[in-house]
């Protein structure tokens, strides 16, 4: 019959199955009485079979029967975007205006007395009055959602027996099987399990992808559905290495969920243990964060695992999985002593990801954390950037040297937004150190000329921070604002302290040389302003051009002019 052509069924199944499933999932969220919203008049029908009215009244949230009397039926539909689907459903599928028997009668639905179901439910002597009231108000709540689902299962069984196309897709590419798994709730698991088994046993495609690349089997693995029977039924016909839009396979998801039995079953069926998602993560990486049992399962598999040492260690650090890290180290699977192309180490990663337990473990195994990345960051500066005082305390307890403290505080103060309290902790720790003589010589001091002072306004406060040598205090700050640096050169605190040692004198000379250079550039620019072309340049460009000359060249040009 033409009626059973796929083109027709695609439309009817969209309403009949998907909408019913969506209604069931939404019904549990209903906490107020049913309020009739603005419905669109679909049709006015005459000579309507009472069975039709009973059938349509099962879904008051889909369409509202405004009037039924003298064989006249006014049907309103709330979803304006799909009004045409409703008209098609009522005219062509239910055959309301046809003299021959209705579609419901043809399918055998008349043998299922829905009114009797409702009557028994409402008039049950043991029924809670609140539930009866909800039914009378047209509500649908989780109290009787199982009843609705049971009824839906009956309808779907009849539809399948009449060769309905059960894998029709909605606008998101979802079939009814997708919908059932998406909306799966443990509280109604029995009804959902029955419906899913009906669909699976009748050949619903477990590999059909929705618009997000999810197959029903992937969804079953992704969601918290611990039903071994459903899993095994799906597995019989599923592509075990299918991927979603992020490249995750079913084995990725069951490993993430720590479902040991499902992981074991997939591996035994030949699932690819080295499949990588778009982030480069394999199922093994997803499973190792949960403990030793899954790790052993993967290591004992017949397939050789592809191990990216840096990636896997960082993955363990991100999840602070110390137990798994220790086990893999004891098995010789990983090595924590790596350095990236950015000179980042495992300890630096632990600080960056605030993995306290992993950091303690790594420091106890290998206490060397005095490394500087290619961007100038250190473990200490990273702890300040993360506002993590606990990690800062443990790092300072390991007694870092001045050699790493100065670059750390330079990196900290490069950022306008930093935790001042954590910076003061660094200053207190550094100021009383005496080994700065072995670190800085006068000749190399010029490299610090842009890092002399940051917290100019905090000098007086810092005097109370147990500072023994003012020059050390001066060197641990950085500054990009030349005007602030010039202000500091005239500050009374500097004038008093810069004569303490040769370093203070050198800092003073640096400031003097900067001032001298500024004067040279200013004078030369004024001399050149007499020329027509030079005067057309903006002052910022003039300054950048003249900055390329050294002091001797500037002096020579001034003499020539």
UniProtKB/Swiss-Prot annotation:
Query: Per its UniProt record, what PROSITE patterns does this chain match?
Result: ANK_REP_REGION, ANK_REPEAT
Q: Does the keyword Repeat apply?
A: yes
Which SMART domains does this UniProt record tie to the protein?
ANK (SM00248)
Q: Which Pfam families match?
A: Ank_2 (PF12796), PRANC (PF09372)
- ANK repeats span which residues? 68-98, 172-208, 212-242, 246-275, 279-307, 342-371, 375-404
Keyword entries, A-Z: ANK repeat, Repeat
Cited PANTHER family? ANKYRIN REPEAT AND PROTEIN KINASE DOMAIN-CONTAINING PROTEIN, ANKYRIN REPEAT-CONTAINING PROTEIN-RELATED
Functionally, this protein is described as follows: Contributes to viral release without involving rearrangement of host actin.
Name the protein family.
Belongs to the orthopoxvirus OPG189 protein family.
For this entry, the protein name equals Ankyrin repeat protein OPG189
Which gene is the coding source of this polypeptide chain?
OPG189
């Amino acid at each position: 019959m033409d009626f059973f052509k796929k083109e027709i069924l695609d439309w009817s199944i969209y309403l009949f199955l998907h909408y019913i499933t969506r209604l069931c999932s939404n019904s549990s969220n209903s906490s107020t009485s049913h309020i009739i919203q603005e419905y669109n008049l679909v049709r006015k029908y005459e000579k309507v079979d009472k069975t039709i009215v009973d059938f349509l009244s099962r879904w008051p949230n889909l369409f509202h029967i405004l009037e039924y009397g003298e064989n006249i039926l006014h049907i309103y539909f709330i979803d304006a975007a799909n009004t045409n689907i409703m008209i098609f459903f009522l005219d062509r599928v239910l055959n309301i205006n046809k003299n021959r028997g209705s579609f419901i009668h043809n399918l055998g639905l008349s043998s299922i007395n829905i009114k009797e179901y409702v009557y028994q439910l409402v008039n049950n002597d043991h029924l809670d009055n609140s539930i009866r009231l909800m039914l009378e108000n047209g509500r649908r709540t989780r109290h009787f959602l199982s009843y609705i689902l049971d009824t839906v299962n009956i309808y779907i069984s009849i539809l399948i027996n009449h060769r309905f196309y059960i894998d029709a897709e909605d606008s998101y590419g979802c079939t009814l099987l997708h919908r059932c798994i998406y909306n799966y709730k443990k509280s109604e698991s029995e009804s959902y399990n029955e419906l899913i088994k009906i669909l699976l046993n009748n050949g619903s495609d477990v590999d059909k992808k929705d618009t997000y690349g999810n197959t029903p089997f992937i969804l079953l693995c992704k969601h918290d559905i611990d039903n071994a029977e459903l899993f095994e039924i799906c597995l019989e016909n599923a592509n075990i290495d299918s991927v979603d839009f992020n490249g995750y396979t079913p084995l990725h998801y069951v490993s993430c969920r720590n479902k040991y039995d499902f992981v074991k079953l997939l591996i035994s069926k030949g699932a690819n243990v080295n499949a990588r998602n778009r982030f480069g993560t394999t199922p093994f990486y997803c499973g190792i964060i949960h403990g030793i049992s899954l790790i052993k399962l993967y290591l004992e598999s017949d397939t050789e695992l592809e191990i990216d040492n840096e990636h896997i260690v960082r993955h363990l650090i991100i999840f602070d999985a110390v137990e798994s890290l220790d086990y893999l180290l004891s098995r010789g699977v990983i090595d924590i002593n790596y350095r990236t192309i950015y000179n980042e180490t495992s300890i630096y990663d632990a600080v960056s990801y605030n993995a306290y337990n992993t950091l303690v473990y790594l420091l106890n195994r290998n206490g060397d954390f005095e490394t500087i990345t290619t961007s100038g960051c250190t473990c200490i500066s990273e702890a300040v950037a993360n506002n993590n005082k606990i990690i800062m305390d443990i790092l300072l307890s390991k007694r870092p040297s001045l050699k790493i403290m100065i670059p750390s505080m330079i990196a900290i103060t490069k950022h306008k937004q930093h935790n001042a309290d954590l910076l003061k902790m660094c200053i207190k720790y550094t100021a009383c150190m005496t080994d700065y003589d072995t670190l800085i010589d006068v000749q190399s001091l010029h490299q610090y000329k842009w890092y002399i002072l940051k917290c100019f306004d905090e000098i007086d406060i810092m005097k109370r921070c147990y500072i023994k040598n003012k020059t050390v205090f001066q060197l641990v700050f950085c500054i990009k604002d030349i005007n602030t640096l010039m202000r500091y050169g005239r500050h009374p605190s500097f004038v008093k302290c810069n004569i303490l040692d040769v370093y203070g004198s050198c800092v003073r000379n640096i400031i003097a040389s900067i001032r001298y250079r500024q004067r040279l550039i200013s004078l030369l620019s004024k001399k050149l302003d007499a020329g027509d072309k030079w005067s057309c340049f903006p002052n910022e460009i003039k300054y950048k051009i003249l900055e390329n000359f050294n002091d001797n060249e500037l002096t020579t040009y001034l003499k020539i002019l």
